[in-house]
């Protein structure tokens, strides 16, 4: 227990010291070269901000939903060892049906189309 306390104390102290140094060092000698963006030795050609596609964001959200579905269905084989394996099958089928209906709805609304 004493070893864990020592390690946590050292970690917190070292993190605080490094964070303080990282904020303090750039303020010692600021100049234009340090404050400008670096593009392989060339002057920046354009804005660093690019427009973000909303469709990409929607597809990323759909991916996260289906990834979460897989995480929910992974323990399904162990559900057979419960007292009521039929109930486990019913709930997993309900989750799959709900997500399939959501995917069909998104598809029919055109949310998965890249071209407008």
Curated annotation (Swiss-Prot):
The answer to whether keyword GTP-binding applies is: no
Extract the GO molecular function terms from the UniProt entry: NADH dehydrogenase (ubiquinone) activity
Q: Which UniProt keywords apply?
A: Electron transport, Membrane, Mitochondrion, NAD, Respiratory chain, Translocase, Transmembrane, Transmembrane helix, Transport, Ubiquinone
Q: What class of enzyme is it?
A: translocase
Keyword hit for Translocase: yes
**What are the GO cellular component annotations?**
mitochondrial membrane; NADH dehydrogenase complex
For membrane topology, the record states:
Multi-pass membrane protein
InterPro entries reported in the protein's UniProt record: NADH_UbQ/plastoQ_OxRdtase_su3 (IPR000440), NDAH_ubi_oxred_su3_sf (IPR038430)
Q: Where in the cell is it found?
A: Mitochondrion membrane
**Family listed:** Belongs to the complex I subunit 3 family.
* Biological function: Core subunit of the mitochondrial membrane respiratory chain NADH dehydrogenase (Complex I) that is believed to belong to the minimal assembly required for catalysis. Complex I functions in the transfer of electrons from NADH to the respiratory chain. The immediate electron acceptor for the enzyme is believed to be ubiquinone.
Protein name per the record: NADH-ubiquinone oxidoreductase chain 3
Gene from which the chain derives: MT-ND3
């Amino acid at each position: 227990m004493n070893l864990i306390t020592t390690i946590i104390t050292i970690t917190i102290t070292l993190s605080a010291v490094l964070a303080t140094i990282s904020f303090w060092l750039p303020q010692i000698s600021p100049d234009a070269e340090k404050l400008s963006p670096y593009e392989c030795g060339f002057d920046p050609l354009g804005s660093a901000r690019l427009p973000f596609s909303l469709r990409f964001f929607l597809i990323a959200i759909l991916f996260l939903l289906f990834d979460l579905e897989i995480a929910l269905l992974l323990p399904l084989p162990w559900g057979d060892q419960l007292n009521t394996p039929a109930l486990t099958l019913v709930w997993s089928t309900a989750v799959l049906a709900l997500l399939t209906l959501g995917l069909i709805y998104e598809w029919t609304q055109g949310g998965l189309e890249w071209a407008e």
